[in-house]
Amino acid sequence: MKIELQKWSFEDKETLITICNSIDRSYLAGRIPNPYTEESADWWLNMVGESDGKNAVFRKIVADGKIVGNISVEQKEDVYCKNSEIGYFLLPERCSKGIITEAVKKICEIAFQELDVIRIRGRVYEPNIASRKVLEKNDFSLEGVLRNAVFKNGEIYNLCMYGKLAGDRANG
């Protein structure tokens, strides 16, 4: 399977809406509107256009020519300005196929080249074993667990904090 990361464009809006209304939100933060509307997509695509390459890298994940998800690395501010955070989501039917593992490898390379950062962090709800494995396969280190740190849908979760430094071994 050929995995590519490509820049988002307004021509992708309908696909973005479809994906965002199809994803499993069990372990996602609440920042992605639900339902995901045309207005949501317009706002987000404008923000991506303004931020990409400056303080963030946003890419659509393309598997065998089809857009199947999103991945991003966003630079932090103030005293955390050399840090960034990775986030991703994928169509449910494309999970467990190695797509996200490859996409994380690629986005980390891009982020360390394009952004003025030395560190990428990943925050994962403790029961999200698949996402934890994705980060670990890409040389992210488990740096700690924040106990009872997340409250979502009436449940309390521990939050696993992962980190990858620019000098950490490349996956592969």
Model regions: which residues?
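Secondary-structure transition/hinge residues
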Residues: D24, L28, G49-G53, R94, ...
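Residue-level marker of structural boundaries
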Residues: S22-R25, N34, E50, G167
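A short helix-loop-beta-strand connector motif used in the catalytic cores of GNAT acetyltransferases and
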Residues: N46-K60
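Conserved GNAT-fold acetyl-CoA-binding loop/helix
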Residues: R25-N46
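Acyl-donor (CoA/ACP) binding surface of acyl/acetyltransferases
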Residues: M1-T15, I19-S22, I61-G172
